[in-house]
A protein has these predicted regions:
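Contiguous interface-forming segments/domains that mediate binding rather than catalysis
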Residues: 1-109
Length: 109
């Protein structure tokens, strides 16, 4: 039985959160990954931007793990017919030391 989009995304988001935390400097307590689909839509790769509001001058490039996770997200979205044009994926460290994440999608209406 095929997994739902939410089940696919849940697994991918966990991989992506771990990869994003690993890619950022240890002094960052939050990070944002912006993914933008090309004008032709999903399937042709995504533009990636990683940033921190606390450290706007720091430069972080996507690792292989981030690229693999975002490609998996793109392919899962295509497989389930979920056409989005932009995704902002945020991770933040809680006072307990644990990391939480949230993903927000922009879709054409």
């Amino acid at each position: 039985m095929e997994q739902s989009l939410q089940e696919d995304q849940s697994l991918i988001f966990r991989r992506l959160a771990d990869a994003l935390v690993e890619a950022t400097p240890e002094w960052w307590s939050a990070a944002e990954l912006e993914l933008v689909a090309p004008p032709a839509g999903l399937g042709g790769g995504l533009a990636h931007t990683i940033s921190s509001g606390e450290y706007p001058r720091d430069i972080v490039v996507p690792t292989d793990e981030i690229m693999e996770a975002t490609r998996a997200l793109e392919l899962a979205s295509l497989r389930h017919g979920d056409a989005w044009r932009r995704c902002v994926f945020r991770v933040a460290q809680e006072p307990s030391g644990h990391w939480c994440f949230v993903a927000e999608f922009e879709r054409d209406t």
